[in-house]
Amino acid sequence: MPAGLTEPAGAAPPAAVSASGTVTMAPAGALPVRVESTPVALGAVTKAPVSVCVEPTASQPLRSPVGTLVTKVAPVSAPPKVSSGPRLPAPQIVAVKAPNTTTIQFPANLQLPPGTVLIKSNSGPLMLVSPQQTVTRAETTSNITSRPAVPANPQTVKICTVPNSSSQLIKKVAVTPVKKLAQIGTTVVTTVPKPSSVQSVAVPTSVVTVTPGKPLNTVTTLKPSSLGASSTPSNEPNLKAENSAAVQINLSPTMLENVKKCKNFLAMLIKLACSGSQSPEMGQNVKKLVEQLLDAKIEAEEFTRKLYVELKSSPQPHLVPFLKKSVVALRQLLPNSQSFIQQCVQQTSSDMVIATCTTTVTTSPVVTTTVSSSQSEKSIIVSGATAPRTVSVQTLNPLAGPVGAKAGVVTLHSVGPTAATGGTTAGTGLLQTSKPLVTSVANTVTTVSLQPEKPVVSGTAVTLSLPAVTFGETSGAAICLPSVKPVVSSAGTTSDKPVIGTPVQIKLAQPGPVLSQPAGIPQAVQVKQLVVQQPSGGNEKQVTTISHSSTLTIQKCGQKTMPVNTIIPTSQFPPASILKQITLPGNKILSLQASPTQKNRIKENVTSCFRDEDDINDVTSMAGVNLNEENACILATNSELVGTLIQSCKDEPFLFIGALQKRILDIGKKHDITELNSDAVNLISQATQERLRGLLEKLTAIAQHRMTTYKASENYILCSDTRSQLKFLEKLDQLEKQRKDLEEREMLLKAAKSRSNKEDPEQLRLKQKAKELQQLELAQIQHRDANLTALAAIGPRKKRPLESGIEGLKDNLLASGTSSLTATKQLHRPRITRICLRDLIFCMEQEREMKYSRALYLALLK
């Protein structure tokens, strides 16, 4: 036996083995059982026999009185599989047989006088009582050894152990209760992986189930609105629940649903207003508003108006009708508004902490499951080969404290960091009964945590999942630790790094019941959103997460369970952060919190992680109001009012009614029309307006097309330009004229300078004309100089900003050497569209009705 592995003082009662392989525990009066096994190589597929040696004292069978412990060990063998992906273990629970005839053999060296009786004292140890009243303390130490020799005992039970197989050990302690309805049990199921050689692909598990029973004389009932493992005896009357139930009978189911929604809305409003992210003044003001609303001091309109101002939120149109429908009935169900507000405030302080953090190890573990208590203890030890790691589960009963602070703690931790590569994996199960973790206090805290001390993880997985918690009238709380699979990241992984991290705690707030419900109505918990962050563990490897779905159920006896599958990924977000607070129906809050050392960092990020402002603003969602249903109801009830505004609107005439009616009667005299109805006048006025609108639209399009310049557009190519051709011809004429004028001037100058016969009249005329030409040129030069002087005195011409910007852009393009780049020119369209007579004539020519009309000819004459 390894050092330190000894049987506790409270040894288990003796056991016997039947021919069918059933190990039967005798009630009181036998020696412990020693189970031995032969070590076999880990990779072998052979069976490892396990022998159970029992030395009987007498050959007569023993009957199983009350308190008999029956244990059956049934192996489940499966061939080893090597694959790349992990798979979940498939544990199978074997039914327990009824105890048959039992034979107990004592060692040969033990001499007992006739009439000796083996009994178990109240303190735990076994005692031999002889007829002479001599009391001898028996040796109750059970040795766990591993030896290859097979004991020479005809009554042996061989348990075959194959790698990658799963075996279950089921131990059930049943005590006949006085009343079955008062039986309360606590079930602890723990599964431990056993990895194979090269890659961890199949995980065999050892399932240990402990079901203690304790008789009571009262029938326990469970409150539907409570989520903790609390029970209240039925002999204590609950006047508030009876009164609430009596009121509920008089209300219709629809009204009850509205009242429930309104109550949840007010409770959630108080919670969010009193949360840490809001100011204390806001919480006080919101509580005061709720109190005034419940006491009928203010009505729904004033309550919502003040609430919007206090929360700085946008108005919700459906909140006032919702409150009007349900607040009257809510006032009847909640006569005391102070107690309701006090319960809502206290709900934030009472939390139920359920924390699970399971970690897989790559070595072969030895499982020791211990449920300790001050009650009577019964144990059985099954041992195999030496294993390098021991994992123990202990349920401890804390010291007695205040009435509202009782708690049950279940701790699962690993012991021993050493690793071994060979030998048969041995599972050691030490099971002891304990009293149920059941109190009658409303605020009960149950903590389940797994703290690995120094596990060696090689590409393994850390799984965090909600335990399956089931509440009922005939059973207590069943806390199930789910199985864990190791996942090998790659075949080339050679280094093993220790992962040391603090456990993650999941807090499940347990508010007090605000409105008691009938005992037959189950209450389901629906999780909106659940995001978990894994705490950082220093320089650790990336851990792959396999999420297991768990079940969170609250039910009554005889009701069907309503599971809510929740998958919690933990590897997609940064460590030590909380993303969302989860709001559950029935005044329940499910939040996530890391280790106590990280609370300060989490509080700093509360404003950025939580979005309580959105929840406060969205009051309709908190009240559980379906907007589609409300809209349908409103449209259905007010359908007769639709269209009244349109029917009551008066048509505004486009033209003056008096002048229009006179003109219509003047035209109608030719057709014997002497009277005209007002509706006809209005219709003609509207028709005139529509005709003018259509005509203006056409004229606007025609004017825009007329004023559009297509020359600058890249989509058009200039094929002929008559205007430029005419300008070219005009320029030629001007050049010809300038040439002729220049020749005439030169001729005049030559004639003026000549000294020919002065009496020639032709010569005198030329001289006079040359002198006039010189005077004209001098006058033009003086006029140009005067204009330049005036322009210099006025100053430079101011350019438009748009033109200056375009010129600056051109200068920049030329300076940077990118003058070859040409921007796409858009069609120039003026901002003001001017319609002229040409546009109207063109429009009239295009219309078939106006093409041959008199108006077109009158327009053409203009």
Curated annotation (Swiss-Prot):
<dbReference type="GO" id="GO:0016251">
    <property type="term" value="F:RNA polymerase II general transcription initiation factor activity"/>
</dbReference>
<dbReference type="GO" id="GO:0051123">
    <property type="term" value="P:RNA polymerase II preinitiation complex assembly"/>
</dbReference>
<keyword id="KW-0963">Cytoplasm</keyword>
<dbReference type="GO" id="GO:0005654">
    <property type="term" value="C:nucleoplasm"/>
</dbReference>
<feature type="region of interest" description="Sufficient for interaction with ZNF628">
    <location>
        <begin position="100"/>
        <end position="241"/>
    </location>
</feature>
<dbReference type="GO" id="GO:0046982">
    <property type="term" value="F:protein heterodimerization activity"/>
</dbReference>
<keyword id="KW-0744">Spermatogenesis</keyword>
<comment type="function">
    <text>Cell type-specific subunit of the general transcription factor TFIID that may function as a gene-selective coactivator in certain cells. TFIID is a multimeric protein complex that plays a central role in mediating promoter responses to various activators and repressors. TAF4B is a transcriptional coactivator of the p65/RELA NF-kappa-B subunit. Involved in the activation of a subset of antiapoptotic genes including TNFAIP3. May be involved in regulating folliculogenesis. Through interaction with OCBA/POU2AF1, acts as a coactivator of B-cell-specific transcription.</text>
</comment>
<dbReference type="Pfam" id="PF07531">
    <property type="entry name" value="TAFH"/>
</dbReference>
<dbReference type="GO" id="GO:0005634">
    <property type="term" value="C:nucleus"/>
</dbReference>
<comment type="subunit">
    <text>TFIID is composed of TATA binding protein (TBP) and a number of TBP-associated factors (TAFs). Heterodimerizes with TAF12/TFII20 via the C-terminal H2A-like histone-fold domain. This heterodimer forms a histone-like octamer with the TAF6/TAFII70-TAF9/TAFII31 heterodimer. Interacts with P65/RELA homodimers and P65/RELA-REL heterodimers. Interaction with POU2AF1, via its C-terminal activation domain, is required for octamer-dependent transcription. Interacts with ZNF628.</text>
</comment>
<dbReference type="GO" id="GO:0060261">
    <property type="term" value="P:positive regulation of transcription initiation by RNA polymerase II"/>
</dbReference>
<feature type="region of interest" description="Disordered">
    <location>
        <begin position="219"/>
        <end position="239"/>
    </location>
</feature>
<feature type="compositionally biased region" description="Polar residues">
    <location>
        <begin position="219"/>
        <end position="237"/>
    </location>
</feature>
<feature type="coiled-coil region">
    <location>
        <begin position="722"/>
        <end position="787"/>
    </location>
</feature>
<dbReference type="InterPro" id="IPR007900">
    <property type="entry name" value="TAF4_C"/>
</dbReference>
<dbReference type="GO" id="GO:0003677">
    <property type="term" value="F:DNA binding"/>
</dbReference>
<dbReference type="InterPro" id="IPR037249">
    <property type="entry name" value="TAFH/NHR1_dom_sf"/>
</dbReference>
<dbReference type="GO" id="GO:0051059">
    <property type="term" value="F:NF-kappaB binding"/>
</dbReference>
<feature type="modified residue" description="Phosphoserine">
    <location>
        <position position="595"/>
    </location>
</feature>
<keyword id="KW-0175">Coiled coil</keyword>
<dbReference type="InterPro" id="IPR009072">
    <property type="entry name" value="Histone-fold"/>
</dbReference>
<comment type="similarity">
    <text>Belongs to the TAF4 family.</text>
</comment>
<dbReference type="GO" id="GO:0042789">
    <property type="term" value="P:mRNA transcription by RNA polymerase II"/>
</dbReference>
<dbReference type="Pfam" id="PF05236">
    <property type="entry name" value="TAF4"/>
</dbReference>
<feature type="region of interest" description="Required for interaction with P65/RELA">
    <location>
        <begin position="511"/>
        <end position="533"/>
    </location>
</feature>
<keyword id="KW-0805">Transcription regulation</keyword>
<feature type="domain" description="Histone-fold">
    <location>
        <begin position="653"/>
        <end position="702"/>
    </location>
</feature>
<dbReference type="GO" id="GO:0007283">
    <property type="term" value="P:spermatogenesis"/>
</dbReference>
<feature type="short sequence motif" description="Nuclear export signal">
    <location>
        <begin position="516"/>
        <end position="556"/>
    </location>
</feature>
<keyword id="KW-0539">Nucleus</keyword>
<feature type="domain" description="TAFH">
    <location>
        <begin position="256"/>
        <end position="353"/>
    </location>
</feature>
<feature type="region of interest" description="Required for interaction with TAF12">
    <location>
        <begin position="830"/>
        <end position="862"/>
    </location>
</feature>
<keyword id="KW-0804">Transcription</keyword>
<dbReference type="InterPro" id="IPR003894">
    <property type="entry name" value="TAFH_NHR1"/>
</dbReference>
<keyword id="KW-0221">Differentiation</keyword>
<dbReference type="GO" id="GO:0005669">
    <property type="term" value="C:transcription factor TFIID complex"/>
</dbReference>
<dbReference type="GO" id="GO:0001650">
    <property type="term" value="C:fibrillar center"/>
</dbReference>
<dbReference type="InterPro" id="IPR045144">
    <property type="entry name" value="TAF4"/>
</dbReference>
<protein>
    <recommendedName>
        <fullName>Transcription initiation factor TFIID subunit 4B</fullName>
    </recommendedName>
</protein>
<dbReference type="GO" id="GO:0006367">
    <property type="term" value="P:transcription initiation at RNA polymerase II promoter"/>
</dbReference>
<dbReference type="GO" id="GO:0005737">
    <property type="term" value="C:cytoplasm"/>
</dbReference>
